[in-house]
C-alpha cells in the first residue's frame, strides 16, 4: 500500500540531510509531505506561531506516518515536538531516524542527536508518555535506510492500525 509520510526535522540545520531521506522515498513512487520551500517557511515564521501551526496541520493532513529525522539539535525544536504531539494525538504511525551519518552539502557528517523530545502525551492513567517509550528509532547509515525506510514506514503504519 502506498503511504504518504510527513517528515519532521530541524529545518535550518538539517534540510540537506532531510532531502537525502525524502528523495530516496519519492524516487520509489511514494509521496512525501511536510517539505516546504524555504520562502514558505520564512513567510510562516514572519506571520507567527498560528501560521506555522496551520502550515504543519496542512502538511500532516492525509498522512499515515510521521518520520522524525533526528539531527544533533532536533530534540530541542519546538515545532518538531508539536509535529510529534499532533501525530501521536491523531494516531499516526511514528518513527525516528537518526540522520547524523548522512553527509551535508560540504561532505560532513554530524554528531548524533537524541530522541528525548519530552512528554508527547499521557497514558490512560494520566502519566506522561515519551517518544522513546512508544516509537522505534533507526539509524539511516547503520540500518541501511535507503534500502529499509519503506519497511520502517510500513511497520509504523501497521502498529498504528493504518
Feature-to-residue mapping (PLM):
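Short, well-structured hydrophobic secondary-structure segments
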Residues: 59-71
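Conserved TIR/SEFIR loop-to-helix hotspot centered on a Trp-containing motif
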Residues: 73-89
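A short helix->loop->beta-strand "cap" motif at the edges of active sites that frequently abuts
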Residues: 90-94
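Short catalytic/ligand-binding loop motif for oxyanion handling, primarily in non-cytosolic enzymes
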Residues: 14-17, 76-78, 102-107
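C-terminal interaction surface of TIR/SEFIR-family domains
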Residues: 4-6, 105-162
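Conserved beta-strand segments of the P-loop GTPase G domain that flank and frequently precede/overlap
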Residues: 8, 68-71, 97-98
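Conserved N-terminal substructure of TIR/SEFIR domains
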Residues: 1-62, 146-162
